[in-house]
Amino acid sequence: MLIFPPEWVPTAPYLALPSLAAVLRQNGIETVLKDINVEMFDHFFTSGFLLFVKSKIQARLRALRQREQGERLSPEDAELKQMLSDYQLIDLDHHITKVARAKKIMRGPEFYEVEKAEWALNAFREVMEYISVCYFPASINFYPVESNLNVYRPWVSEDLLKVPYDKQVNVYADICRQLVLRSIKKEKPDVVGISIGTPVQLMAGITFATLIKEAYPDIHVTVGGNVITRLKDEFAKLPHFFGKVFDSMITYEGEHALVWLVEALSGKRKLSEVSNLIYKDEEGNMHVNDTYQENVTELPPPDFDGMPWEKYFSPEKLVPYLGTRGCYWGKCTFCDHGAGYIDQFRAKHAEQ
């Protein structure tokens, strides 16, 4: 199973999962794709999730009122209590109806009517404010993708270890329990790969990996993607992450590395032979394997089978394609695009 965690623009698939799936399936490896990013946003705008949020707001408010009986609340908690009380008064059924209509607008021809599209986006934003109150002080957004858990820092390892267990602020933990773990229970994968391509995905990706390992310790969880590649040297110095948060890391490009990892886990090769892999052995020793760069002219086209096309917030099917990797120039001081690749610029032939 391959998982793409939040958050990314929910208008089209990110190319990582289809690119990996194409090579895995080419090698006879059954692969399930889960774009949890778009599934999360679709889930946010459902009556089931919004009623769940309502119950969480009520629970937080009750807890503050009970505390107030025995002690004086701090100014911050008193302000939170008032905010939660105010949001108890909103007409939730009205907003549930609005976002259901908004989803139809965003996914159909009415999207091209500017006033209707703006109305739909505002309907989403109103509901996101309600969700953010539930997870306060987190700020959860639909678009632009700028959500922030605020009390946790994504570049601090201690925070990454703590955040999966925060049931008050971490919305991604609830999404993992409601969407990810249920899918794993249904599909029963032997290996789960989580592609973390952007910094804003780090909290969600680490949360998913941790809770998957906790619920299914026998599943091999591997993480990869551009951000993981950038942090490879730091994670290699943190052996306590391996086995608890995830089992291995795949750096740089992962198409064939993931195939070789699956083969190694099934006894067909040694883990030491899997290029781009970082892992910890049974004795607790860390291993950073050699690197491998894909020949893009030999890669199959991306395989989108299994992507939830009906859930993307777009009136048309937007199919991404990548004809090149790396950068032919690579000297711009303001750009770090090349950090996700080993070195050279590569391009497919025009007929491909």
List the model feature ranges, each with a label:
Residues 1-2, 278, 288, 320-322, ...:
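Structured core elements
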Residues 3-6, 189-195, 245, 318, ...:
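Glycine- and acidic
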Residues 7-54, 62, 70-71, 87, ...:
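Glycine-rich beta-alpha loop elements in corrinoid/cobalamin-binding modules
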Residues 58-85:
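Aromatic- and Gly/Pro-rich amphipathic surface segment
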Residues 76-99, 104, 114-120:
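Extended, charge-enriched "interface" segments that sit outside catalytic cores
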Residues 108:
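A substrate-binding/cap region within the structured catalytic cores of diverse enzymes
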Residues 297-352:
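Radical SAM [4Fe-4S] cluster-binding motif and immediate context
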